[in-house]
Every structure is written in structure tokens, then in C-alpha cells.
Amino acid sequence: MVGFPEYVGVVKDYLLVIEDKADLAKHIKLDDKGNISAETAAITDYAVNGAVFYGKHLAENTSYKKVIVFGVSGDEKKHKITPVYIDETEFHRELLEVESFISFNEDNIDEYYIREILKENTD
């Protein structure tokens, strides 16, 4: 049906998936209920939709319990990075946009997970 994500990597026990589109207009497509569309055309043409599709597939077919996917669109100067968390049940939740991937390196990813995904205070 569709190809492969641009990037798949592992940081600690997190599986990270990046789907990239050059055009900001191809960042995300929502359905009429405001959810991330799972239509084939949306998966192939939009960054976030493709990332969620790949992430769900990997959550289902690997042993990873924590999958964070990123829909990335635009270029270096003007871009959007939308992370979406997917757990082993394939539940997914769109997270706040980020400016870069610094929160997802080995030193920061656990704190990001606790603060942004579990919604617990890390102070």
C-alpha cells in the first residue's frame, strides 16, 4: 500500500519514526471529526498521517511499547515538527509541536516522556 518512513531510530527504549514532506501544506490532514485521517491518500501525501500509519504498524509488529512518530514538513527556515505518541495498544495522541529534536536525545527523552506524555511534573 505505502512505502517506508524517512527515518526509524531507537533512543533508549523508544522507537522514533520520522515522515518528512517538503511542502508545509502537506503537514497533516484531519478527517471531518478533527482526527488524523487514516485514508490511504492522506497516509501517502501527508507527513503526520504517514508517520502515524508507520508508527501503528511498528507498534503492532515489534516489541517496542513506546513509539514516538514525527510528521515533519517544510525546510530549515520554516518548518513544522509534530510528535505523536503511540503505545502498544496503538492508541495515539498528538503532542505539542516542537522546534527541534533536542528533547528526544538520550539525555532528554525520559524527561520529555514523563512531562509531555505522562503529564507528570519533572522538577
Predicted regions and their residues:
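Charged, often low-complexity linker/regulatory segments
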Residues: 1-3, 14-16, 28-29, 105-123
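A short, conserved, highly charged catalytic patch centered on acidic carboxylates
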Residues: 1-68, 72-84
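Domain-level recognition of nuclease-like catalytic cores that cleave nucleotide substrates
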Residues: 56-120
